[in-house]
Amino acid sequence: MGAVMKLREFSSYAASPAVDAPPSSSQSQMDASTTRLRQGARTFARLSLDQRIVLVNAMQQGFLRVAKRMVQDGCKAKGITLGKPEEAEEWATGPWGVVRQLRLIRESLVALKNSGDTPIGPVGGTIDGRLSVRLFPGNAIDGMLFRKFTAELHMQAGVTVESLRRDRARFYRQPDHDGRVVLVLGAGNIAAIAPMDVITKMFNEGKVVVLKMNPVNAYLGPYIEEAFGEAIRQNFLSVVYGGADEGRYLVYHRDIDEVHITGSDKTHDNIVWGPPGPEREMRMQRHEPLLKKPITSELGNVSPFIVVPGPYSHSELRCQAEDAATSYLMNASFMCCAAKMLVLPKDWVGSDVLIRSLQEICARVPPRQAYYPGAEDRWRKLTTGRAQVKHLGRVEPGSLPWTFISGLDPNAPDEPLFTQESFCPVIADTRVGSADPVEYLERAVDFCNNTLWGTLNANLIVHPQLLKDPRINEAVERAIAKLRYGVIAVNAFIGMPFVLAAPTWGAYPGSTPEDIQSGSGVVHNTSMLEGVEKAVLRAPLTTFPKPGYFASHRRSHKMMPKLVAMEENARWAKVPGIVFDAMRG
């Protein structure tokens, strides 16, 4: 295993989804789309708040109409059996976030109309003197369904209470354009990503959107076209299809003002700097990108799962193993936020207990279809020739086993699992520090910041009893402040901030085009705040009833459609059915 190992770019593999999708768009069709959107851009930028609210309502109702069919096709494409708990994944990673985001955007637009401000919670401070803004729970139903969960944004240095208010919802208060066309290059793994990116660009930033579907899940495009049909009819949105060639044509198109991509850093660099070779190197040295347009991006991560040593009971460690398993197993581990590196304390008995619990949970989950192009190739390159590899589950044709790689040396400079996103069902562990919580946190933060690739997200597990010690409590808060990740989940599933939609989702700020890491810019952010450094979700160490997103929940496929329906208007009448299924999970 050496530094010379390079994993191929995702787009270099042919996509062959199990569900039929529309054919690639021709250049004339793409030209027609961009021309139409160019005509609609100024109109959209000048819409009144009332007109935007009407459009949001139409888009949300449209998405509710297609949700079930969208989930069914997603399950078919990924080899998931309908009517089983695994079906819940497609509800959780598809309609839930989209319907919720549209509700929260509507609430923000109504608040802007009525008060001139978007809704936020209490403003506080962080241990390093920055402002923090509470965003979740946003209402009593949030608080009841996710008891003692909180989400806040930590602002960048220099953001003041005055600038926090002045810069909020900037497009609506201080418009910086009179109509722009943005190209959104959709992700191929998670159904919600493309529509949620579209919603962000349209309603946070006031831009019209050309959405190019990813070939891996292009079968979802017709559902997005149907759901967001009103935006398409008014020339505010167009959906096109194709692979790298079509994407390249649109990226440099004269009618595209800017680009947003969810994908890999390799794809980003090909767009910004051109194909690998001497010419790219020269451009990078001269800081002369091939792409002259603004680009924002979310580009993946080697996601750490950090466990602070403490007085955990067996059931408490088991609950956190469920969190880790959910992050690792969901969507067959084809997620940018999937747990990939267990960063555990040296010389602490709980490290082995956690790994055993995690492996026991994974062993009961049948291996999933490796639907993402290149998965088997990546898996073989990362696992072949290693000594401490454990495969779990009976592998069927087309699937890959849940794979654990143990005992990685944290000081190994050429370990590919530290420096490259695997994007396949591989998880590894490494040990740092000691059983002393403060020493461990210092070492773990240093390792994650300076050894692991990426700046998107991190999990931090800490026992509440430890926080009663002022010294340890301070060390935990300093660790949260120092971790250079855009999203941090404390004692919670890392995918929750994504689907909650109110927090920002994106890389830690400060990347450069030459070293993009996990990307630049943020999406979601339904309160439309500026100057965000990171989103922080905190949860209890254990929760009851069992969260519906846990891989072991027995009725999640019954509960998730009800949760999606509730998110339409956040009505109490729709809560009892959710609670009933949650309690029986």
Predicted segments, located by residue:
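Catalytic cores of nucleotide-enabled group-transfer and carboxylate-activating enzymes in metabolic
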Residues: 47, 54, 66, 81, ...
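C-terminal core of ALDH-fold dehydrogenases
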Residues: 54, 441-550
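Active-site-adjacent "gating/activation" loops or surface patches in catalytic cores
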Residues: 148-192, 196, 205
